[in-house]
Amino acid sequence: DAVVKTIDIQGVDALLVKKGTAAQVAWADEIQQIYIVIDGPIDQTEDLIKIARNLTVS
């Protein structure tokens, strides 16, 4: 079973999902009408969160 948690990414509620050896951060940008997913190995979860918090989409 996956472990799902809500975290803040750029002022938006995002999902942090962990299952097995994988982790994923996902959220929607309603202004640009896009859905963003960043995934990687579970041991790099903190790095994935840092990337998500600093991501700029234009």
Name each model-derived stretch.
Residues 31-58:
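Surface-exposed amphipathic alpha-helical segments
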Residues 1-31:
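Short, solvent-exposed recognition patches
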